[in-house]
């Protein structure tokens, strides 16, 4: 076992994903998820040494109890894992304009994460709790905690991409602009694509589609992000599981003025009750939409709107490629597994030279990637993402 092990923590508002990864060879020694925080059914499940395990955390348990369980129950069974830890990597959703790359966590970095709380009110406070608990649980690694920001990869966007057409002082004084998210995933799959296409990263022109319960598309030119679909928050852009993505902002005024909804109710509607959930009025699960596309009107409606929006973004981002698009890339839970989403979306993009091979497309799922396009047509790559590995690599690189 290597002494290059990194504990990777991804703290959500009601969950904590964790893993222990060898930062050099990518081997995963432990992975798990603690969820349903602050509820009676709070629980934790994990994989270690080829076995799957789960346990109750106790009613009302949250981040502190989950980390205590990881340290005192899981790692106590395998003390050599704890002994080999050299760093802790934290996924941070929003780093604002301050962070263009990963950073060792100092008081200044903590303040920067706090300053971005208004733009990520569910995520950043949870990240801060995770950092605080990690410092308590692993005091010997106090100066080896690293923040890896979802927003960092998008900081290469030019002004014409990140500015909204609002009074300029709102940007200068209040930092209201496009930031973008899923940056770690877009970064990882673009680097993997460079290997597949046998091109130097700095010459790579691709459009990456991270499609999960949240989803975003990124235009990458010469290896750098030049535009992305999510905005100030992760609400803008694509149709998502429960988020609406792009809408006319005046819809909000109509909901308030004509339907009498208050701001909190409108926020809940747009973030928790829209997207696939809203269009089907049944579920946010894309598998339902795929399975019932031919037989249920709600599933067809949701899938058609979803793929229309996705194709529109890919098409518009092709205009930013300066005449050369090397490939489109699909990743994330939906991007890696939903063959129908890929096929229906790319079918709309024949003008760009995409032509899907039906059998290759069906075969690319459950961790199996590859080029799903017919020979001689523009590549469409399915590449499983590995955000945890990027976080581990960055944490090790900065602290070694």
Curated annotation (Swiss-Prot):
It catalyses: acetate + ATP = acetyl phosphate + ADP. Mg(2+). Can also accept Mn(2+). Its cofactor is Mg(2+); Mn(2+). Keywords: ATP-binding, Cytoplasm, Kinase, Magnesium, Metal-binding, Nucleotide-binding, Transferase. GO terms for cellular component: cytosol. Pathway: Metabolic intermediate biosynthesis; acetyl-CoA biosynthesis; acetyl-CoA from acetate: step 1/2. One of its GO terms (molecular function) is ATP binding. Transmembrane segments: none annotated. ATP binds at residues 17, 210-214, 285-287, 333-337. It is an enzyme of class 2 (transferase). Gene3D superfamilies: 3.30.420.40. Its EC number is 2.7.2.1. One of its GO terms (biological process) is acetate metabolic process. The record marks 182, 243 as: Transition state stabilizer. InterPro entries: Ac/propionate_kinase, Aliphatic_acid_kin_short-chain, Aliphatic_acid_kinase_CS, ATPase_NBD. Mg(2+) binds at residues 10, 387. Substrate binds at residue 91. The keyword Transport does not apply. It is found in: Cytoplasm. PANTHER family: ACETATE KINASE. HAMAP family: Acetate_kinase (MF_00020). NCBIfam families: ackA. Catalyzes the formation of acetyl phosphate from acetate and ATP. Can also catalyze the reverse reaction. Belongs to the acetokinase family. This is Acetate kinase. The gene is ackA.
């Amino acid at each position: 076992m290597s002494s290059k092990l990194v504990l990777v923590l991804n703290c959500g508002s009601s969950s904590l994903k964790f893993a222990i990864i060898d930062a050099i060879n990518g081997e995963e020694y432990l992975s798990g998820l603690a969820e349903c925080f602050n509820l009676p059914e709070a629980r934790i499940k994990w994989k270690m040494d080829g076995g799957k395990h789960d346990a109750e955390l106790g009613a009302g348990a949250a981040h502190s109890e989950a980390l205590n369980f990881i340290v005192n129950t899981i790692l106590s069974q395998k003390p050599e894992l704890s002994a080999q830890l050299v760093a802790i990597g934290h996924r941070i959703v929003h780093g604002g304009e301050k962070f263009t790359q990963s950073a060792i966590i100092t008081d200044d970095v903590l303040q920067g994460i706090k300053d971005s709380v208004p733009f990520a009110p569910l995520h950043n406070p949870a990240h801060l709790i995770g950092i605080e608990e990690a410092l308590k649980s692993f005091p010997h690694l106090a100066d080896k905690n690293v923040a890896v920001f979802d927003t960092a990869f998008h900081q290469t966007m030019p002004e014409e991409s990140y500015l909204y057409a609002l009074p300029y002082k709102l940007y200068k004084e209040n930092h209201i602009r496009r930031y973008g998210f899923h940056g770690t995933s877009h970064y990882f799959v673009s680097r993997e694509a460079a290997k597949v296409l046998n091109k130097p990263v700095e010459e790579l022109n691709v459009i990456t589609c991270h499609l999960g319960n949240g989803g975003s598309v990124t235009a990458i030119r010469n290896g750098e992000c030049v535009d992305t679909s999510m905005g100030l928050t992760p609400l803008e852009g694509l149709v998502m599981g429960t988020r609406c993505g792009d809408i006319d902002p005046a819809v909000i005024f109509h909901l308030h003025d004509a339907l009498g909804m208050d701001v909190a109710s409108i926020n809940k509607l747009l973030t928790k009750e829209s997207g696939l959930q809203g269009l089907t009025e049944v579920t946010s699960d894309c598998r339902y939409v795929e399975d019932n596309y031919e037989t249920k009107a709600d599933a067809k409606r949701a899938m058609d709107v979803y793929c229309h929006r996705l194709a529109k973004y890919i098409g518009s981002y092709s205009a930013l490629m300066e005449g050369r698009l090397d490939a489109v890339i699909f990743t994330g839970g939906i991007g890696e597994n939903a063959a129908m989403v890929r096929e229906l979306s790319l079918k709309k993009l024949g003008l760009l030279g995409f032509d899907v091979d039906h059998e290759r497309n069906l075969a690319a799922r459950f961790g199996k990637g590859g080029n799903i396009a017919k020979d001689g047509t523009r590549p469409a790559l399915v590449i499983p993402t590995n955000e945890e590995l990027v976080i581990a690599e960055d944490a090790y690189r900065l602290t070694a």
